């Protein structure tokens, strides 16, 4: 919330009123299988996504872990290697971004990953101080 003092009168302005409707940005986060990264990156470039952040992560879900044999001994691997891919996109690109990630990352097997969407309040480019869409 924002309070504004004008001519000795205090006004309350909902923070949403400062943004034009539809001008918000979203953080699309996807956890995918590592070998699908190039396909996902190329697909996102085709729909206009110009920047990504990628982090190597480990996790498990329904896929659980698996047993590996190393030098004659069995080891249980509980956390499986995945990649977390993140992109900040304008509202208009959210659905095409999600559709592209699904199309490019899907193998049809357990462990294909997850996608979630988070609202971004503000983005600032450190070098120039630009903010909002211009910073993406």
Language-model-detected regions and their locations in the chain:
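Positively charged, small/polar-rich N-terminal and surface patches that mediate targeting and assembly
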Residues: 2-136
